[in-house]
């Protein structure tokens, strides 16, 4: 918004017909002053209030990409999604031990629809079968606005129907709870819908209540949740940021509420715990363990809280024989070292935690990050190991895909209200759209560099 005046002045000088935006380019959104029409063969589709994108083969629209696509990518594909709830006689499943053992994970239909309708039409034919295979990899569904919670019910109903039809092994639902008020307090790219100053805590509790209602309705569906990426980690290292300091008590109150309300027999939860390059440093490790354990015990040590999730939307390796130069000074240069350093401190404080790791974008090691803290759309990355419980470490429950690969980390447009400088760094792929929207060039990068390959 700081460039609004200059944008208005520039608009007065523009010719009557503006240049058309190229395929995948931005064509609208809050604060956008560039082209609003697309080249032939593409249409301007509004994906969220901040971003509209020229999508090939699409028709102009002012709604978000549908999240109720019937496409499914699990091995059982004969049962269409249904919104019918379970019968009163449906048994409640109980999560105990490693919640991933004995289950296959639900392949996110929304992500599958992005790959099939956004990515594949413009890919070279040689990459299309590989992209189709990516769409079949289970990835977490992000409940990043309250409006997506009903879709959770649609997916749980679909899982329930498939399980009743004999899915073997049974399917588990996988979701990210991500809607704190004043979210992303130390950055700008993923600011959310709720403000602490505008009834944000109450709104968040209503959001959690709605999630709980879905989980109770589908009590026979085993469901795994990742709770609030970046939130608690920001309270360890970024209280010098005014927005984080102001949000501290609200974050703690909201996360506490989530852990208590979602502590259900059919649920397993993992609190987000940043990553090795954030909280693995010796100065951060102890305070982080203290905070995570306190949050866990203050919530009553909920049975459904299994442990911590690391490397969410990040790029770190699981296990390295040689630490990259950008990790210098941190003995915990990979996620295996990080969790094995963290676990004893947690246990001593009353939290016998297990871990999961996001491997969706860590296929290339070492990364091409200029600095370990560079997080936005990093160049040269590739899809990593597929979801698996074969981790080789008793602390590590599973490798999973939490970040949907191909969705942007943040915009490189410096005039955007949600622009974060990290997205303009030399090691960030540009031009990039708003956080959460489709980034075709990034998907192609991940696909081309996938390790193991597709």
Swiss-Prot record:
Top EC class of this enzyme: hydrolase
Annotated spans, Disordered: 68-95
Annotated glycan sites: 413
Taxon lineage: Eukaryota, Fungi, Dikarya, Ascomycota, Pezizomycotina
Location, primary (coarse class): secreted
Subcellular location field: Secreted
PANTHER family, alphabetized: 1,4-BETA-D-GLUCAN CELLOBIOHYDROLASE C-RELATED (PTHR34876:SF4), PTHR34876
Protein name per its UniProtKB record: Probable 1,4-beta-D-glucan cellobiohydrolase C
GO BP, sorted A to Z: cellulose catabolic process
Reaction(s) this enzyme catalyzes, per UniProt: Hydrolysis of (1->4)-beta-D-glucosidic linkages in cellulose and cellotetraose, releasing cellobiose from the non-reducing ends of the chains
Similarity field: Belongs to the glycosyl hydrolase 6 (cellulase B) family.
